[in-house]
């Protein structure tokens, strides 16, 4: 076991994490040169295109060090984005060490720091590495100072490398072997294995990626998953080098995969503990928690007959993404669709993009909402994730909304505009620190303000230099109201929005004005109203199209004209009683665009 090193790589987006992983695999001969391709470990097209890692992957490599010994290196590639922070913490808890990759030309950024703190809390040894030193703009001294200043670990002997050219990659591996401790664990103890990730394979069912903490596992053993208590016979075990290779046994300290004929991905939860069915471990490994969706949105097919296809596509996505939740939902305006729960905005975009791309769906998405905790006047508490399900104002005692702690990092030139943005979003400042030219701001902001467009606006006010990460803090009482849109006195459920009272009039007016432009003129007047409960806060009128009934009157008495006008008015009144207004699909999309401003 002294020759095993389990490590992962922590980095902000675009600091070269996947490229460094590619180089390490190449140096260790994990893949022949002809099989090498960019971003070997990012298997989804969308991961490659956006340059992000979504699912954790592993590679078991062997490396002959300069001291002549052969070491087994297990690289666990982690997602870097804040939406997947739980998966990151599981990947990190399976390691003893982490390479902290920092772009020498850009210094420390938000997600680096967030994941690095997670690593330090889990007791993982952090090894700093400066990447991209071949760039003309590289400033290693500055980057080292930032690492020491912001994260507070000693980086004076940080290894310098360039993952693109392969320069210094062996030095990185040597530093890794020297600084990272070998795994602890007892191969003879009862089996405890941590599920780092799991995915669905069409041929063998669920594949679980595990780190064996104690004990030994062999094929044909019967295993038990401790969160659910379900039992399965093991069919295959092995390691990825990044290609899969079957083995006869996996023992303490190793990272590998288990295939046990599990049909449902929800059975193999990330962070759960695997043990033997007969000789079970006394207790599971710490840190397991159920992942709860934070952001909800309705997904509706543009064509009503695509509903079944959408359901099948969601089922298939769910096979590979246990954190996606969905349930059927009916809207009078948009027909049949699904209410889906996501971990965060990036997760939502990825699911939408995969539905559109891999399954060829045309979708309408309603505005993203968060989950509110509503205390009703009879004392019961309900969780509301859909504006249409919000009780009437008279039955509500108090509404609590989720608050998140946001950490922002930016060059000091942009502090002013970022603070202004946070204040507009009802944020309250907790902390502000200067690290050289970088500034770290900590704010508490309602989650609802973040899901709309916070990230895009942050990037635009800081010209792309600011980076952020957020984590859920608590539910806090807040004065939020539900704004309904009425057309000729009828509520349109899909257009309801939940906003803070201070913004309700402005938002109501804006949506009404937008709808006035979009709904075509009818043969009678159409009133568009925004209301909170029974209280109307905004109104727009669409004037009727009318025929000129006086065209045939030349001169003559005024009473004749009056009679014709009265008759027309009567007719319009009758039409208004029976007519219903068709709301075009664009109206819904327009509402979403109002929210993007």
From Swiss-Prot:
The keyword Metal-binding does not apply. It is a peripheral membrane protein. It catalyses: GTP + H2O = GDP + phosphate + H(+). GO terms for cellular component: plasma membrane. GO terms for biological process: positive regulation of translation. It is found in: Cell inner membrane. Required for accurate and efficient protein synthesis under certain stress conditions. May act as a fidelity factor of the translation reaction, by catalyzing a one-codon backward translocation of tRNAs on improperly translocated ribosomes. Back-translocation proceeds from a post-translocation (POST) complex to a pre-translocation (PRE) complex, thus giving elongation factor G a second chance to translocate the tRNAs correctly. Binds to ribosomes in a GTP-dependent manner. This is Elongation factor 4. The lineage of its organism: Bacteria, Pseudomonadati, Pseudomonadota, Betaproteobacteria, Burkholderiales.
């Amino acid at each position: 076991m002294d020759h095993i090193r389990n490590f992962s790589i922590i980095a902000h987006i675009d600091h070269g994490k996947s490229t460094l992983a590619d180089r390490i695999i190449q140096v260790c001969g994990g893949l022949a040169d002809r099989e090498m391709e960019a971003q070997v470990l990012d298997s989804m097209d969308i991961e490659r295109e956006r340059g992000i890692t979504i699912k954790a992957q592993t590679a078991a490599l062997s490396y002959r060090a300069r001291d002549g010994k052969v070491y087994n290196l297990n690289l666990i590639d982690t997602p870097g984005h804040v939406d997947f922070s739980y998966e990151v913490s599981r990947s990190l808890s399976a390691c003893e060490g982490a390479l902290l990759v920092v772009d020498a030309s850009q210094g420390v950024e938000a997600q680096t720091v967030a994941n690095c703190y997670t690593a330090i809390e889990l007791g993982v040894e952090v090894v700093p590495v400066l990447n991209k030193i071949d760039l003309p703009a590289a400033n290693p001294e500055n980057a080292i100072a930032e690492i020491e200043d912001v994260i507070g670990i000693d980086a004076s002997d940080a290894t310098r490398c360039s993952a693109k050219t392969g320069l210094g990659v062996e030095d990185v591996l040597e530093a890794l072997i020297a600084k990272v401790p070998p795994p602890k664990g007892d191969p003879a103890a009862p089996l405890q294995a941590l599920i780092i990730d799991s995915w669905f394979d069409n041929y063998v069912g669920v594949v679980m990626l595990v780190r064996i903490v104690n004990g030994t596992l062999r094929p044909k053993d019967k295993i038990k998953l401790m969160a659910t208590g379900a039992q399965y016979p093991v069919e295959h075990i092995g390691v990825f080098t990044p290609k899969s290779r079957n083995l006869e046994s996996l023992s303490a300290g190793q990272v590998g995969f288990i295939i046990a004929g599990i049909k449902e991905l929800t059975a193999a939860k990330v962070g759960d503990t695997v043990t033997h069915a007969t000789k079970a471990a006394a207790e599971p490994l710490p840190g397991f928690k159920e992942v709860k969706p934070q952001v909800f949105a309705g997904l509706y097919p543009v064509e009503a007959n695509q509903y079944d296809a959408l359901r099948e596509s969601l089922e298939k996505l769910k096979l590979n993404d246990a954190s996606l939740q969905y349930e059927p939902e009916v809207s009078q305006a948009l027909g049949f669709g699904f209410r889906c729960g996501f971990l965060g905005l990036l997760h939502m975009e990825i699911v939408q993009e995969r539905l559109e791309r891999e399954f060829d769906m045309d979708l309408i998405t309603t505005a993203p909402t968060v989950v509110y905790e509503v205390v009703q006047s009879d004392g019961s508490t309900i969780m509301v994730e859909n504006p249409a399900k919000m009780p009437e104002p008279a039955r509500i005692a108090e509404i609590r909304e989720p608050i998140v702690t946001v950490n922002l990092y930016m060059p000091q030139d942009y502090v002013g505009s970022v603070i202004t943005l946070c204040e507009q979003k009802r944020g309250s400042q907790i902390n502000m620190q200067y690290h050289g030219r970088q500034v770290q701001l900590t704010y508490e902001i309602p989650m609802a303000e973040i899901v709309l467009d916070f990230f895009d606006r942050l990037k635009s006010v800081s010209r792309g230099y600011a980076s952020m990460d957020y984590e859920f803090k608590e539910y806090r009482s807040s004065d939020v109201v539900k704004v309904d849109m009425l057309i000729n006195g009828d509520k349109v459920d899909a257009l309801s929005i939940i906003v803070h009272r201070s913004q309700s009039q402005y938002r109501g007016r804006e949506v009404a004005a937008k709808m006035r432009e979009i709904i075509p003129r009818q043969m009678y007047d159409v009133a568009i109203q925004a209301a909170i409960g029974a209280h109307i806060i905004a109104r727009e009128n669409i004037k009727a199209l009318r025929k000129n009934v006086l065209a045939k009157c030349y001169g003559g008495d005024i009473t004749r004209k009056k009679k014709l006008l009265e008759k027309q008015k009567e007719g319009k009144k009758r039409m208004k009683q029976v007519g219903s207004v068709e709301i075009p699909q664009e109206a819904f999309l327009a509402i979403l665009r109002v929210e993007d401003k």
